Amino acid sequence: MCSPTQPTLAAGNVVDQLKRAGSAEEFFTLLGVCFDPKVLDVARLHILKRMGQYLASEDLEAMPNSVAAARCKAVLERAYEDFLTSTPLDQRVFKVLKDAVAPKKTHFVPLETLK
């Protein structure tokens, strides 16, 4: 499904509008990013989490609204593309998925403590 090429953001703060978005589809529509519903059905939370990771070091509030909107769009496209070529299991953006492949810690119990 392809959203319009122009974002559907209303006049005002892009960050506030994205905070009010109720679904991943709304993020894509607001920012004017095309998406495949099949990909979004499987990886919606992963894509949005990755978008947040990419934006974590940026101060969107300090940017002019048009620049912030363009930056959000570019980052959402980048996050979405991450999941076009790999799966959420490959990307492991959530802690539970990272922990699943982390080496298991062995616990050492000294023999003296077993008396």
From Swiss-Prot:
Example of a GO biological process term: nitrogen fixation
Function statement: May protect the nitrogenase Fe-Mo protein from oxidative damage.
InterPro entries reported for this sequence: NifW
Cytoplasm keyword on record: no
Keyword Transcription included in the entry's annotation: no
Subunit annotation: Homotrimer; associates with NifD.
Keyword terms, alphabetized: Nitrogen fixation
Family: Belongs to the NifW family.
NCBIfam families reported in the protein's UniProt record: PRK00810.1
Name of the protein this chain belongs to: Nitrogenase-stabilizing/protective protein NifW
Pfam families from the UniProt entry: NifW
